[in-house]
Amino acid sequence: KRVQQKLDKNIPIVTTPGAAKALKNLGCVRTIGLAHWDRLDVEKGSTRVRITSAPGRHGKLGAQALLPSVMGAVYDFGADPAQPAYRMYVTGDTLIHDDLKDIPQRVPGIDLALLHLGGTRILGVFKVTMDAQDGVQLLQIVQPRHAIPIHYNDYDVFKSPLADFAREVKAAGWGDRVRFLAHGERY
């Protein structure tokens, strides 16, 4: 409710089709719903970015019907989004699933991955976001040049602390490619 009250209804929001519809019903006038692999090119002056919706899944197949749909996003920055100068992947709140294996084929050469971690559990049982092991598994699938864990301690339902991910990263040999940032620190 607090977010709804403070949300600028005129700001552009790129999200899932279902969330775009719900936001429009709340009075947001510039929502864009992207299904998996849909693209949106955005230009402002000479600045260009292509946003590609990547697959995400908030729960196991049976639980998906009870949870909102989610998406990741790939941002291609540069004068020609088809040949980006920089490519960034934001996982969104997903779990590991087979569709993630399509990412390196469809959008290869990811420079930076922002990994939503935390191992969120609903009712203490149902995992709906990646934990430490899942985060490393995603790194192995997507093979980004660099990665930063985010969204790992924002709520009490997060059960997989950042220290667990740091241990898994080191054990998997990814220590030189993963950067750990304190809140407010820049990359």
Regions found by a protein language model. Name each.
Residues 2, 34-108, 183-187:
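Core dinuclear metal-dependent hydrolase active-site scaffold
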Residues 2-6, 26-27, 99-103, 164:
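A short acidic, amphipathic alpha-helical/loop segment
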Residues 3, 19-20, 38-40, 154:
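Alpha-helix capping/helix-boundary segments
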Residues 7-13, 86-88:
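Short active-site oxyanion
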Residues 12, 18-21, 95-185:
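Cap/insert and terminal regions of metallo-dependent hydrolase folds
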Residues 21-26, 41-43:
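Short loop/helix-cap segments at secondary-structure boundaries that form the rim of catalytic
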Residues 23-35:
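Helix-loop-beta element that forms the nucleotide-linked donor phosphate-binding surface
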